[in-house]
């Protein structure tokens, strides 16, 4: 009887541990979007610039990984963010992806840790309510290129 109870307890512990690992490593959800100056709001953004944003939202790890590239942005790129707002509207920053000093044709990748799991869940549930944009100085500090997620 003791052996059966001990086996049951060990078996349950293994199942719980494996469930926790599966939740923590959810494989992430990829989201990609094309970035253009025409998408910026309020516009105009950079009319000659383009870009690409590839995100992986890892809810169980509280992490957003990104690979963002852009071309022909006027000035110096200094930041990239995820904002919350529908297409055509500006919105507040919800995740700061990168900052620094980059050329008008460049790329950057990395992961942002300690992102609220509920925010990641919300983005995964309704990606079209969020957008990625890249900011440049001196002409487009509010955003040079933008792409709505889920489109």
Would you name each region that the model predicts?
Residues 2-80, 84-151:
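Metal-centered catalytic cores of metalloenzymes
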């Amino acid at each position: 009887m003791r052996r059966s109870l001990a086996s049951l307890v060990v078996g349950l512990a293994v199942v719980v541990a494996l469930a926790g690992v599966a939740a923590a490593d959810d494989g992430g959800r990829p989201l990609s979007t094309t970035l253009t100056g025409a998408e910026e709001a309020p516009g105009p953004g950079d009319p000659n610039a383009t870009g690409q944003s590839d995100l992986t939202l890892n809810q169980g790890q509280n992490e957003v990984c990104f690979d963002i590239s852009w071309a022909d942005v006027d000035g110096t790129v200094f930041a990239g963010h995820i904002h919350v707002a529908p297409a055509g509207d500006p919105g507040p920053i919800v995740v700061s992806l990168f900052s620094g000093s980059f050329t008008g044709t460049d790329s950057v990748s990395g992961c942002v840790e300690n992102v609220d799991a509920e925010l990641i869940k919300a983005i995964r549930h309704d990606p079209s309510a969020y957008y990625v944009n890249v900011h440049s100085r001196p002409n487009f500090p509010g955003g040079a290129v933008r792409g709505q997620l889920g489109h």
